[in-house]
Amino acid sequence: RNIENQLREAGVDTTHITWFSTDAKGPFSTDAKGTLMNGINVTYRGKGVIPSKTEYYRAHTAVRELGPGDVDLDKIFVSEGVRWAHTGGIFTLLSPKTAELAVEFMKKAGEQGTLRSFDLNYRSKVEPDKQKAHGINRKIVAETDFLVGNQGDFSDALGYETAAEKGVPFEEWLDAYADMLRVVAKDYQNLKLIGTQLRAPHSADRISWTAVLYDTQADQIHQATLRENIEITDRTGGGDSFASAVIAAIMEGKGYDEAVEWGAAHGILVQETPGDTTMVSKKMVLSEVARAKKGGGVSALR
């Protein structure tokens, strides 16, 4: 219940949480030995030349037991009219059942005209078999409107490669990345938007940062303002924060030029704070967008 309370403190609606019991009673029960737990990840943030490192404990977690039919999707998408559906590559690869649930979830959302996004977010420690990951992820991408993934994600999670090598000038890399996105968009004509954050690490605590969105229908790249050589506190959460801010901007009716700026701003702000759970306000995001566009410094708020 501690996790539920923390979610409530952050303003998250917890009414749809599925609770597993340990008394061997009901549809979501274990063997009465308490063998299910909530997932844990432990991250060393890194410092200087020492890279960050994350370890996961996902075995015996309740979420791995969720499968098709376990979530009342009619209630979510029909009765409640949820406007946006999102899932990611960590959840989808936790177990065969979560993969099936993710496909069911995205298909149901699509039937109701709900916008759907999928963050590839490949983690080899969750699913080391890339061929297996490709097969699962391709089913979900076929049910997606907004796809999120960096160069490594597209290679590891879907099997797409870019022509550019690591370390090439940014413009050369962006051209190669855009060419790859055009191939992805041709293969999955359901996709409306593809995006990613771009992090160039100079050390564990100093990066350059931007983001791009590719409008598949207009064949147009939208790039956020580049932030160069920025000191950060903790690199975790930058990708999730990029995606969530882009989604928020689109849901507010903003264009892609503005949406990508929101995504980049939110992403860098979360990397300036410990952990990967945002406590950043919309006001802070808009302020950072304005600051970056002006190329200005940081003034104290009094």
Pin down the residues of each PLM region.
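Conserved N-terminal subdomain of the carbohydrate kinase-like
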Residues: 1-89, 286-302
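Conserved phosphate/ATP/ADP-binding segment of small-molecule kinases
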Residues: 112, 126-217
